[in-house]
Every structure is written in structure tokens, then in C-alpha cells.
């Protein structure tokens, strides 16, 4: 994870609070590349990128896997509706 971050940011400070890690950073890459990195990180972490007192802070918090597992079970157990046509044939005008 840190290696990926260092490709796009210069890290000049780090702080760990519980399951959250804050990196104090300076961007090295264009915004489009940083967005790709944030998307990649968001698959494993809750991600925040913000300015705090004039410093850019990248904050990563570990996602609790139990929650997503339960969500998947709940979604799987919901009955699905039979497919419906988008337009009823009787309402189509010619």
C-alpha cells in the first residue's frame, strides 16, 4: 500500500490512530492519476483526501470485512422480481 502511495505522493509525515493511518503528503502526479489511486485504495480502505491547516492529508481506515460479508448474504437472500418489459405493449402508439 505505501509503495503505491509513494508513486503519487511524497510522504512527509505519518500518524496511526487505531485502525486509521494518516499520511501528510505532497502530490507528485496529475489529478487523474491520483483519482485512480484513490479508487484502488477504496477497495480495501475508507479513503479521505483533504486539506487540514494548509496540509494535504490522505487518511486510510481499514474496512470491517464482516459488514460487507453480511451485506452480501442479505442481498443474496432477497427474492428477485421476474423481469418486466420496459413498456407495456398496449401503451405503445403507432
From Swiss-Prot:
It comes from Archaeoglobus fulgidus (strain ATCC 49558 / DSM 4304 / JCM 9628 / NBRC 100126 / VC-16). This is Uncharacterized protein AF_0054.
Amino acid at each position: 500500500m505505501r509503495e503505491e502511495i509513494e508513486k503519487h505522493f511524497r510522504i512527509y509525515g505519518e500518524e496511526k490512530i487505531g485502525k486509521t493511518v494518516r499520511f501528510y503528503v505532497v502530490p507528485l502526479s496529475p489529478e487523474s492519476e491520483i483519482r485512480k489511486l484513490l479508487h484502488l485504495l477504496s477497495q480495501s480502505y475508507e479513503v479521505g483526501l483533504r486539506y487540514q491547516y494548509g496540509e494535504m492529508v490522505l487518511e486510510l481506515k481499514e474496512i470491517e470485512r464482516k459488514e460487507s460479508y453480511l451485506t452480501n448474504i442479505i442481498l443474496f437472500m432477497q427474492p428477485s422480481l421476474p423481469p418486466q418489459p420496459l413498456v407495456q405493449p398496449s401503451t405503445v402508439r403507432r
